[in-house]
Amino acid sequence: MKMKKTLAFIMTAALTVGTMAGCSQATLNYAQELSNTAKWEATTSSIDGDLNINVKGKDGTETKQEIKFAATGYTAKDKSYVDMTFTDPAGKLNIPELKAYCDGTTSYINKSFYQGISSLNGQSAPTGLNNITQEYIGIDTEASGVDVTKLKALMTQPDGMVEFGKMIFGGNADLDLPFVQNGREYTINLDADKTVDLAAKALKATANNLDNLNSTFKLGLPAESITQMKTAANSPEFDKSLPEIKASLAGTTINSKEVFTDNDYSSDFNMNLQIKDFGTIVLTMKTTDTKSDVKGITFPTSTLKVSQEEFNKLMIPGTKTTIAPSTNVVSK
């Protein structure tokens, strides 16, 4: 339980770096830069990253795992694609290639990716998934009731990131990103204490805004669960746990540097997690986006379009669920 709580704080802080509502001038300037890139008619992107996990056993032994990943992508208005590969230098893990396409509100991912992920833990892919004859599975986010078009349009507004942050954390949340601005370069440097404090504020704000999140994103959370999460986040026990979490993350650093020009954007992200009684997790990632000319995207033709609910049923181990032809759109 202690480890789960620690990792929850880590992930919340990392995600908050990209989505938090802010009010400082540096944050507002950063939001303006993001909105400018969102207005590009077309964007070519690339990602290169390296994840290293070192787990220390109670007997002094160490288990190491490294995963390298790289991706290329292209976006033009509401259409995009990305091709992502994963490499294990030690050859222990065989993570499948991810090929994803987005056409408006529908996102398609290659079926072989889902099958390969299922086999990583030694299990066979769900029968319902294997029974699909099409090569790509598309999930229609519009069917969930979430206005994806509205969310995308929001990001083109000068204060789009700030407004999106308010949507997640609430309009009265006392949150801001600790940006240091130097011209068009924005850096963030967090240690263990700053990481935990930032994550704690974000978790509390999110919990107190769950009613709005539940309705906006159609999460389907029952009222009882929302009440329980609000109570937990605002309890004295929550605040009392923070010093212990800070101590367990002593030595941790999270750093990011983002640079904007009129025609491109680059980001360097480094996360060095030092977790007491566990080990280390180090993630480095470099991202580049370049303003590009508009070109057509060739979408896969062997596709099956389903709702999120139908997809969830397909992924249940041992299920033999099939999708009725009348509930989806198939092209081949």
Task: Put a short name on every predicted segment.
Residues 18-22:
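C-terminal motif of bacterial Sec signal peptides marking the signal peptidase cleavage site
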Residues 24-332:
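Subset-of-secretome marker
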